[in-house]
């Protein structure tokens, strides 16, 4: 059996287990047996059973079924905590079906939205929507830089923001952070973020840092002027102390291929001097901007 088949069956098992547990709240507990359990710690997987009571994992180990307990055999399959989609654009889709079948079928139980400077509502409003109509997954959000610019600058955004406009954006961001936003996201290759000046970003990242948030960025450039774009992100992290993350880091031009080691060395050097920088990747060569 191929690894892909194992993965597909494991994801299906997770989805089936989630569905069964949700529809059987009256039962004392559910026991998943015979699986190879990967607990998320990085340790090798090992055979174990997992007992779930309502919405809580209460035991992992060598367990025997209890009287009246629902038992899900998972012999030969992999059982793991739900996956976190740390860069999700699901907020551009339809939330009408709050059972989130497409995500659960892939084993995803948490999504992080508001990416690339794009969020569609204040964090308090997002929380209100999902409190009123809960979803089958967990959800976290960043505050999009583009959202802030849209609220403050409207259609007149093809320019740097004025000091008064930056102050207004800072106030909106501070309120979002208090409401639970993870921090500030930017999409500096796209409208409207492409028109922002560095001073604007510095002011906003200072606000995010003060509120305990993070900064995540689709940088200004991922090909010809990649180095300057990365320097801008690192400079924001160094000046404000905020954790900074490069979204989907890549060298998107043939002339830069083969220089990844130098880029990683630059990130390591930045971390060595105290900048809290991280980066994420996706496992394919193309991206939305060039498809």
Residue ranges of each PLM-predicted region?
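Histidine-rich, glycine-flanked metal-binding segment
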Residues: 37-82
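Solvent-exposed loop/turn segments at secondary-structure junctions
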Residues: 58, 78-79, 117-120, 145-148, ...
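Short active-site segment of divalent metal-dependent hydrolases/proteases
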Residues: 90-91, 221
């Amino acid at each position: 059996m191929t690894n892909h088949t194992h993965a597909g069956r494991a994801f299906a098992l997770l989805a089936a287990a989630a569905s069964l547990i949700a529809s059987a709240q009256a039962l004392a507990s559910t026991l998943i047996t015979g699986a190879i359990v990967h607990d998320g710690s990085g340790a090798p997987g090992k055979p174990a059973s997992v007992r779930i009571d309502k919405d809580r994992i209460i035991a992992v180990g060598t367990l025997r079924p209890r009287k009246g307990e629902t038992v899900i055999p998972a012999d030969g399959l992999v059982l793991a905590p739900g996956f976190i989609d740390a860069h999700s654009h699901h907020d551009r889709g339809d939330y009408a079906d709050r059972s989130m079948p497409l995500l659960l079928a892939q084993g995803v139980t948490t999504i992080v939205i508001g990416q690339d400077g794009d969020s569609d509502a204040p964090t308090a409003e997002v929380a209100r929507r999902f409190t009123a109509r809960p979803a089958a997954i967990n959800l976290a959000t960043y505050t999009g830089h583009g959202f802030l610019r849209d609220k403050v600058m409207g259609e007149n955004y093809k320019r740097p923001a004025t000091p008064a406009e930056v102050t207004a954006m800072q106030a909106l961001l501070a309120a979002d952070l208090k409401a639970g936003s993870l921090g500030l996201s930017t999409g500096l290759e796209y409208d409207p973020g492409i028109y922002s000046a560095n001073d604007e970003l510095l002011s906003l990242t200072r606000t995010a840092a003060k509120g305990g948030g993070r900064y995540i960025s689709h940088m200004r450039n991922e090909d010809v002027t990649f180095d300057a774009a990365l320097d801008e992100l690192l400079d924001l992290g160094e000046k404000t102390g905020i954790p900074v993350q490069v979204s989907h880091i890549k060298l998107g031009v043939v002339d830069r291929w083969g220089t990844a080691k130098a880029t990683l060395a630059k990130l390591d050097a930045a971390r060595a001097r105290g900048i809290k920088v991280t980066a994420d990747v996706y496992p394919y060569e193309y991206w939305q901007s060039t498809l």
